[in-house]
Every structure is written in C-alpha cells, then in structure tokens.
Amino acid sequence: MITFDASKCVACNNCVRVCPSVEANTVEHDENGKTIFNINPDKCIRCGACVKVCSHQARSYDDDTERFWADLKKGVKIVGICAPAVKLSFDGCWRGVLEFIQKNGVEKIYDVSFGADICTWAHIRYLEKHPGEKLISQPCPAIVNYIRKFCQEALKHLSPVHSPMLCTAVYLKKYLGETAKIVAFSPCIAKRDEFIETGIIDYNVTFERLGELLKRNGVDFDKLMKTRSNFEFAGAGGQMGAVYPRPGGLKACLELENPHLNIITSEGTDSVYKNLSLYSKVAERDLPDVFDVLSCDKGCGSGPAIGKQMSIYRMSGIMNGIEKYNRTKRVKFDRKHRDKQFLQFDKVLKIEDFVRKYKPDDVTEIHVTDEQVEDMLTKMGKTTDTERNYNCHSCGFATCREMATAV
C-alpha cells in the first residue's frame, strides 16, 4: 500500500531516517546505476512516516477511494463510518464534506466516536474480568503491524478489544442489522491492513484522497466553508470517544471510568517503537496496566493521510473544545454514580462481539553476525574506532554500525 516511484527517488535517506523498520527500505540501483531506496512490503508496517517526509513524492500510498467511488456510481449499497479526526482534516467544513458524500449515494454515515465509546467500555469490562493483565492498546494499526512483525514476544499483551473503527462496524452489522457494504473515512494508511484481515469493513478511504475526490468533482472548499450544512451522523452519537484522535485519548477515556488504572502513553516514530522493543524486556511488575500507544506524534490528527497538516495550536484548540463539549454530554449518572451510557452497553452489548485474536506475521529474520558487520565496516572504508563511530546520521541510520548491519 506504500508505493514507490523510482524515477523520483534521489536517495536522500529521509525515508530511512524516519522508518521504524530498518529492513523495510532496500538499497537498489536502477538501469542507469542510480542509487534508489525501494520498499520491502513484507517488512513495511504502513506507518506512512516515509510518505510524510518524502519531499520528492517518490513515496505515496494506495487506498480504496477509486473502487469505493466506482461502486457507489454503480448503485452498490454503501454506508459510511467516519473517524472523529475528520474535524481536523476538514476544519470548518467537515459537515459539508460528509453531506456531499451522502448526497452522492452513501445512505448513512455513522460516527466512529460511538465505536470509541464501545472500545472504552470493552477495555474497562475486560480489565475487570482479567485483573492484573497488562495491555498494549491497539487502535493504531501501524503499532499492531509492528508488534506482529518485530515484537512478537509482546503479542500476548496486545489488547484483544477491536479498534473504534471495527467496534463501530461490528455494532452496525450485529446490533443494527446493517447489510450494506461499509466505507471507513480515516486519516490512516495502515487501516487497510486491519480491514482486509478482519473482513468487516470494505473500503478504506483516506481524508486526503477524499479531499482530492471532491475537488475533481467540482467542490469549492472556500465556498463550502461559508455554506451552512445540516448534516448529522446517523444513529447514536459518540461522547468521550471523540478525543481518541489526540495523544493519550484512550488514557483519558479509561481514567474517567477507572482513575486507579496505571496508564502511560507513547507516540511518534522517534520513541514509540523503541519503547515497544523495550516492553518485553521489562519485569511484568513494572509494566503499566495499559500502554496507550500511537505511531503518529500528534495522534491521528497528524496521520499520513490526514491531508493538509494543521498547526499544533489549532489542533489543540479543536480537540480541547471537543473534549469540553463531550464531558458535558457524558456527566449523566444514576443514583449509584454509574455512567448511564455504559449501563446501556452492559444491557445490550456482548463483549465477545468486540474482541479479536492475533497471530504473528511470518517474517523471515535476517541474522547478521558481528564478523559480517566488521567486514562491511571495513569495506565501507571505516577501519578505525573513530571512523566507525562518526554516527553523523546523514545516511539515515542512527549509527555507522546500524548502517553496516542493514547493508
């Protein structure tokens, strides 16, 4: 799903520098002998970090936008689910965007914030039934891909609870009897892996490609910003699940229900994958109850397919407003101070409908010996300790030794 255009690659090393998977980038030479960095799809986790930093447009991605639009025009019955990050991607006109999609044939569009509320409820109930169990959050599919490929010893800790997207889709199918195909609108490239594997959602349409689609169909976003839209999500609206896109969103939701949980967060490719690699080396007693992790440094609002990147100040302002609004919606308890939304979930939902099992990916590991690394360093002209420890990062790797290992 991450695509590569060799004609545009200048081997600037930016993709290597940000990639959490050293083996996902392969050094090759084109027919003219020019060095290029291709992609090994078996080792790629689809985090999209390389897409965000490639200023030459050599890296891009595929989603399901064209297939979705073609099916819609053929009359295929489709309903939509939309990630709450839509308010960040289409700031000031998200209702108009979804109204356009609905007018063009999508019968209903549901709010994934509601699925995020189900996700929070399922985590709380799961932890109550499994006291002492340590969980790694899984709403981020790039994180799931990384654990399944490179941190398989941590797989037993990966939360069995479905992501908010899948919780929403399961609810539509099992509880509302929805039979139409489901399109998910998201800022995430890697969601496509999750959808293909589970078979619950039929199309991953990224916000970036959705915006391009609207422009091709004559939508003027400046005009859309000034036009009042009456669009409303179908079905039950979400509450605190609307804060999931921000870093620590799951943590905030879980702590509202159980403030005694030990939850720590990590996000961004610079740190989260290092922390995941350390996770299984830590004594069980030192692990948090929940490790809330996201691949993107500012959460889903900075996803690789969000479209135009928003300033951290504007993003924070929007998310704070969303949180304040939804906190006022949520403060509705019964006489025993129990959350009414969760009481309703307890009556209607079965937690087993919202869980999944994971299998490790069959990734062939390449074992490099110290002797091979030493030999490669010598071939690279690095014969002294000083030369072997320049570690200037210009090649994209953190150390000279890491580069020699990759080569």
Spans of model-derived segments:
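Short, flexible, mixed-charge glycine/proline-rich loop motifs
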Residues: 1-2, 7-11, 43-44, 287-289, ...
